[in-house]
């Protein structure tokens, strides 16, 4: 049996507050799961904070091929079928649907109710907040625990994972923008701060990204684990919704030409997965 330990990771400024209270102050907190050896594979292994992988033998690799993207329809939109479990309250269900619909306002992503499609996002309330990165095929779980995950910024965060995006602080150029203080990280959690080869889509590092961890993520001693450079006082991990750069990346990755033109960006001037 897999034994799970749950950690609610929040910035120091919100220590002692409930998850709901801290979110009202604009901080994003995550329920993180640590797995120990066992054979219960009913739920996927969760690595790197909130990224799901099918087994402990696989890495949460970046979405670097066209095969991990959701297909584009002839009308230029990307339709991502979804199913929401019945375990959510009506209010929570409404919040989730609003989060799904938020993508349609500024990107060509259209989350649509499941109608017998093979591949879809299966939104459930499991152990914490987590998602696979990119399209996995068939029903892929996005977990939004009823106890702490049904908030707009967290919904968008996990859906961005499902669309193919990783955490901001794992960017290949992150060392020019943040300093990682591993000496303050909980033992065994250092992998959450690994740097990976990412497609940055011609966009700058974004401290305001909804995909960015907070300053005290995984801290073992109430000291910072991520410090912006050169200005250490820049706010990170406090996004309440997708930033303009988050939106730009979605539009670039999925070639949302109409929306790129609205943002005054050329739709064909950056490298994309093959």
State where each predicted segment sits.
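Zinc-dependent metalloendopeptidases
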Residues: 2-274
């Amino acid at each position: 049996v897999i034994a799970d330990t749950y950690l609610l990771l929040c910035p120091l400024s919100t220590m002692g507050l409930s998850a709901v209270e801290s979110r009202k102050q604009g901080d994003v907190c995550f329920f993180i799961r640590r797995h120990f050896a066992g054979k219960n594979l009913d739920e996927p292994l969760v690595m790197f904070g909130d990224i799901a992988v099918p087994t402990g033998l696989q890495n949460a690799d970046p979405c670097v091929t066209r095969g991990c993207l959701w297909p584009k329809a002839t009308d230029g939109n990307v339709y991502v079928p979804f199913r929401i479990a019945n375990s959510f309250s009506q209010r929570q269900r409404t919040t989730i649907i609003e989060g799904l619909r938020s993508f349609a306002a500024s990107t060509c992503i259209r989350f649509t109710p499941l109608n017998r499609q093979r591949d879809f996002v299966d939104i459930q309330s499991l152990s914490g907040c987590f998602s696979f990165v990119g399209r996995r095929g068939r029903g892929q779980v996005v977990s939004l625990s009823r106890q702490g995950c049904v908030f707009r910024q967290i919904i968008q965060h996990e859906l961005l994972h499902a669309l193919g995006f990783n955490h901001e602080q794992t960017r290949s150029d992150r060392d020019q923008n943040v300093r990682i203080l591993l000496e303050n990280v909980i033992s065994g959690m250092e992998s959450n701060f690994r740097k990976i080869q990412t497609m940055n889509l011609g966009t700058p590092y974004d401290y305001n990204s909804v995909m960015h961890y907070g300053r005290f993520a995984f801290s073992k001693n109430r000291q910072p684990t991520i410090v912006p450079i050169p200005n250490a006082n820049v706010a990170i991990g406090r996004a309440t919704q997708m930033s303009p750069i988050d939106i730009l990346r979605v539009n670039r990755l999925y070639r949302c030409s109409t929306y790129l033109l609205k943002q005054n960006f050329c739709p064909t001037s950056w490298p994309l997965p093959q």
